[in-house]
Amino acid sequence: MEEIKVYNTLTGEKTVFRPLVSGEVKIYVCGVTPYNHSHIGNARPAVTWDVICRYLKHIGYKVEFVQNFTDVDDKIINKANAEGSDWKTISDRYIDAYFQVMDAMHVRRADVYPRVSDHMQDIIDMVQGLIDKGHAYVLGNDVYYDISTFEHYGALSGRKIDDMLAGARIEVNEGKRNPGDFALWKGAKPGEPFWESPWGKGRPGWHIECSAMSVHYLGKTFDFHGGGSDLIFPHHENEIAQSEGCTGCKFVNYWLHNGFITINSEKMSKSLNNFFLAKDVLEEYSGDALRYFLLSVQYRNPLDYSRDRLDEAEKNMERLSGVIGRLKELAAKEGAEKTDASRSLEKAAEESLKAFHEAMDDDFNTGLATGAMFDLAKAINIYGTAVDGGLSVDHESVEKAYTALKTIMDILGILEEVWEKTDSPDDKSYNDLMDVILAVRQTARKEKMYKIADEIRDRLDAAGIVIEDTPTGARWKRRGV
């Protein structure tokens, strides 16, 4: 298999990826807390890891991908109380809404989407294990992790224990051994959901949930753990302490964190009230445009949100749709004549596919990978123009370009519906029919029968077929393709 280098947050270095089991990759990514509709910052890790999983499968890995839903949380409880509803109704509503957004952006399903509420026994067992091993202590009806018992606490975030309080989600309790100790289990409060436990009625703390669910599905040690860079501390730092404290094994080999979506260089977040809901963006822009926007830079880099960038993304999707349609036209033509132009097209296909792989092998750099896609699209347009000028088609060269572009775009997950439209078994007969219609229209124009020529154009337009008159002859395409 290809050698992939990834930037590991734990080591602060880019290193060669070595799977725990040859040919297999196990991945856990922290999902959303479903108390509201997802903003586009929440969509970034989903799209990022969708592409990573697609690429790993493409190069031959068997991938097991788990992404959770934190369906028991203060924000969900507060939302339910405010609406006079219950926590499960709220979480179900926004989980459904999350999947609608993911479907619009062609994000494939993870293998498992565990919910906290379905794994209470796993969580309770892990908390008890940490108590038994001296890493946790009971304080009233609460249970806390004693961070002084874990030697490597702070290794992921590069922080010292004394510096870890600023900006952290830490439970305040005067009886804690250390100010930075965090809740594993919280005693029940009036108006909140609760579960029975050895320490009384209560519910889990934020961090223990992901530790318990990831170990349950992927084992004590697995390959990749992902999420937004805002989760490095305290969430992922605490996951390491919990999981390794309980199992005695290394928790994760490679930690990958995506950068923020920013607005005017400030992080997009619901707490700052400077966010855009993904569902609202998708009312104005296609799922392909939003997906491409999220992939337009390498995942670790910040990505500044603007309408101008989304407008440009939409235009790029329209251009690529045209290129796919052009490839379809070329592939339907007969011919096997090698020319300098066809050899240039073959070379562009090979070089673009190679550049795409090199970009993805270098820490999944989709910014460079999309550049390879557009380089190939440009080469296809150049070849198409040459064919319009009378050059004979070389079907083999077109097929190589077709395969290369489709491979790249399948991995990026872009314009899948457009490819599906152009892959129907009736395409050749459809193309042949259109060639006849355009030939009749061209004859009418030569005979100055403009009314008939215009009527053909207008009727085709009404049927969703757009005619483009060029200096080298008429071309057609389906509207929206």
Describe each PLM feature range:
Residues M1-Y35, W49-D50, Q100, Q121-E329:
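Alpha-helical recognition segments enriched in aromatics with Gly/Pro capping
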Residues Y61, H135, I465:
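Short phosphate-binding/catalytic loops that engage adenosine nucleotides
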Residues A80-W87, D111-S117, G200, G228-S229:
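The substrate-binding groove and active-site-proximal loops of carbohydrate-active enzymes
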Residues K57, I131, D461:
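Anion (oxyanion) recognition and catalysis
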Residues T11-K14, L20-R108, T472-W476:
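N-terminal, positively charged nucleic-acid-binding surface of large information/translation enzymes
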Residues K267, F276-V481:
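Structural preference for alpha-helix termini/caps and helix-kink/transition segments
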Residues F69-D74, I95-Y98, R108-I123, N141-F150:
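Short, glycine/charge-rich beta-strand/loop segments that flank catalytic centers
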